[in-house]
């Protein structure tokens, strides 16, 4: 059996053990809530990515770093948005502003919600910052309208399910 730490507790959705680990970390006993996995995710980031609300809330109660970012430039809000977890998104926004989260991420939460087709989150983020929707862009300069266009184009291609003509390598007669 592997080492028990905050990351493994989140991975197993074990809130009871996580609470024990958090208590030990707070008391300075051999545990660190900010340890990272191979992607640079802290336990809080992993909980957000997996949509584990109780784990995330426990970590936040014990002072997990809400400003953490993984190696891909994703923060807690973008990962909770990716998971499509509105309740978790609201919990995070009680502790840090929407604008501040978006300024620290390569892809703003609204763009993530748009790409993942999480309409409830798109509506929620639009309501939070209705004037900023037109200005919201990824670091690549793609706005919400462009992302929606890309999704529609991809959907049309999927419906056609266009196959490329057989080539020498893919020819079944070979």
Curated annotation (Swiss-Prot):
InterPro entries for the chain: Ankyrin-KH/SAM_domain, Ankyrin_rpt, Ankyrin_rpt-contain_sf
One of the GO biological process terms: egg activation
Modified residues (Phosphothreonine): 167
ANK repeat windows: 39-68, 72-103
Keywords annotated in UniProt: ANK repeat, DNA replication, Phosphoprotein, Repeat
Keyword Secreted attached: no
SUPFAM superfamilies: Ankyrin repeat
S-S bonds: none
PROSITE patterns: ANK_REP_REGION, ANK_REPEAT
Listed GO CC annotations: protein kinase complex; serine/threonine protein kinase complex
Signal peptide limits: none
Functional note: Inhibits DNA replication early in developments. May bind and block the action of a replication or initiation factor.
Protein name, UniProt field: DNA replication inhibitor plutonium
Lineage of source species: Eukaryota, Metazoa, Ecdysozoa, Arthropoda, Hexapoda
């Amino acid at each position: 059996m592997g080492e028990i730490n905050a990351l493994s507790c989140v991975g197993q959705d074990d809130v009871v053990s996580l609470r024990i680990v958090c208590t030990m970390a707070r008391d300075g006993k051999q545990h660190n809530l900010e340890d990272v996995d191979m992607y640079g995710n802290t336990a809080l980031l992993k909980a957000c990515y997996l949509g584990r609300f109780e784990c995330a809330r426990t970590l936040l109660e014990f002072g997990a770093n809400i400003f953490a970012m993984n190696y891909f430039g994703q923060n807690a809000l973008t990962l909770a948005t990716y998971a499509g977890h509105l309740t978790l998104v609201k919990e995070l926004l009680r502790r840090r502003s929407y604008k501040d989260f978006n300024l620290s991420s390569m892809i703003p939460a609204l763009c993530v919600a748009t790409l993942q087709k999480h309409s409830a989150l798109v509506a929620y983020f639009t309501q939070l910052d209705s004037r900023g929707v037109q200005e919201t862009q990824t670091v690549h300069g793609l706005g919400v309208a462009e992302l929606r266009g890309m999704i529609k184009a991809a959907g049309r291609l999927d419906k056609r399910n266009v196959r490329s003509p057989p080539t020498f390598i893919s020819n079944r007669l070979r």
